[in-house]
Swiss-Prot record:
This is tRNA-specific 2-thiouridylase MnmA. Keywords: ATP-binding, Cytoplasm, Disulfide bond, Nucleotide-binding, RNA-binding, Transferase, tRNA processing, tRNA-binding. It catalyses: S-sulfanyl-L-cysteinyl-[protein] + uridine(34) in tRNA + AH2 + ATP = 2-thiouridine(34) in tRNA + L-cysteinyl-[protein] + A + AMP + diphosphate + H(+). The gene is mnmA. GO terms for cellular component: cytoplasm.
Length: 396
């Protein structure tokens, strides 16, 4: 086996590298080329990048394509640009907008990995005769019986496992992540050593297809109904004011709600059907149980084989937080997760990712998208009562 756990000598092993134009994927290409692999660089043009071509911190924009091409020339590897714009719009941008219209908080990076990078690009890599597809993600993979498993990376600050939970077993077996054992400073140092022009390039930020980070503009253009005005209602039923579209709000939001109040108020629920933004005290956000859809289970054995009393593991519902103790249950086709410590501000559409433990070497057990959450009994009762009321215009 070679350094990528593949049979054969590196020079007889073709690897397609997904090159975004950033320092991480560039270093992956450089490392594999230096080891003697037959490396082919591929960059995807994913969206109409005119507004983001020269925006600092953008991803997959025109400048990124140029950077990937220059790095490939420096390394002496072939490089191809594939136009996936239409596919990206249908698989990522449109569902992103539809999710917001439904009052959810989507994570487009997960959808992109699941439906474009690790599906279409992977198929392209196989068509090119590649033995594996390598990316610059900070995550590790390793042998696990006859297959491979995902593990958190050495650099916890760069952990991208949250965005890769939907990767299927077949995809994991074909993918390689050479940066999983490195820190970001080490990666930049390697780029400097190799003389790559992207060594000091700023990391991509926010959502790649949203110019200036204003996702509400994109959603309003694609789904005008999301900008329809409606009521801002207290969880106790009082109408406090009006809003200019639920797309401007997210669960847990405090600032910019647009109403004056003598108490701190947070967005606790988005009622898309009634174009209603529900606000309340912080305690109304507390959640101890969530239900998942589109579950991707990467543990050993079928999901249905977990113990009747549940499986103790660790979970995280935000990419920036460490995994916390939880219990996974699967009953009659319904997947739920009980959070031992509770969480605030959980929104439908977000991901819940499962792990073996909370350490840097934790195995990734997959996860799912949050369908709904259970609040405290009082908050649940108030939301149920409020849902039965029709929308109303506040008194002048």
């Amino acid at each position: 086996m070679n350094s990528l756990d593949l049979p054969g000598r590196p020079e007889n092993t073709r690897i397609v590298v997904a090159m975004s134009g950033g320092v991480d994927s560039s270093v992956v290409a450089g490392l594999l080329k230096r080891e003697g692999y037959d490396v082919v660089g591929v960059t995807l043009q994913l969206y109409d990048h005119g507004a983001a071509t020269h925006r600092a911190g953008s991803c997959c924009a025109g400048q990124d394509i140029d950077d990937a091409r220059r790095v490939s020339e420096t390394l002496g590897i072939p490089h191809y640009v594939l136009d996936y714009e239409e596919r990206f719009r249908k698989a990522v941008i449109d569902p992103f907008a539809e999710s917001y219209v439904a009052g959810e908080t989507p994570i487009p990076c997960v959808s992109c990995n699941q439906t474009v990078k690790f599906a279409d690009l992977l198929a392209t890599a196989k068509e090119l005769g590649a033995d594996a597809l390598a990316t610059g993600h900070y995550i590790r993979s390793g042998a696990n019986g006859a297959h491979r498993a995902l593990y958190r990376p050495v650099d916890a600050d760069r952990d991208q496992s949250y965005f890769l939970f939907a990767t299927t077993q077949a995809q994991i077996d074909y993918l390689r992540f050479p940066l999983g054992g490195l820190s970001k400073p080490q990666v930049r140092a390697i780029a400097e050593e190799m003389g790559l022009t992207v060594a000091a390039k700023q990391d991509s930020q926010d959502i790649c297809f949203v110019p200036q980070g204003k996702y509400s503009d994109i959603i309003a253009k694609l789904k005008p109904a999301a900008a329809n005005p409606g009521d801002i209602v207290h969880i106790d039923g009082r109408v406090l004011g009006r809003h200019e579209g639920i797309l401007r709000y997210t669960i847990g939001q405090r600032r910019g709600i647009g109403i004056a109040s003598g108490e701190p108020l947070y967005v606790v629920h988005l009622d898309a059907e009634r174009a209603r933004v529900v606000v309340g005290p912080r305690e109304a956000l507390e959640t101890h149980k969530i239900y998942l859809r589109n579950m991707n289970w990467l543990g050993d054995g079928p999901l249905g084989d977990i113990p009747e009393g549940g499986l103790e593991l660790f979970a995280k519902v935000r990419s920036t937080r460490p995994p916390r103790p939880a219990v996974l249950r699967y009953v009659a086709g319904v997947t739920s997760v009980e959070l031992a410590d509770g969480e605030s501000g959980i929104a439908p559409g977000q991901a819940c990712v499962l792990y073996s433990d909370d350490g840097n070497e934790a195995r990734v057990f997959g996860g799912g998208f949050i369908e709904r959450s259970e609040r405290g009994a009082e908050a649940e009762a108030m939301l149920t009562k409020l849902a039965a009321r029709p929308a109303q215009i506040p008194a002048e």
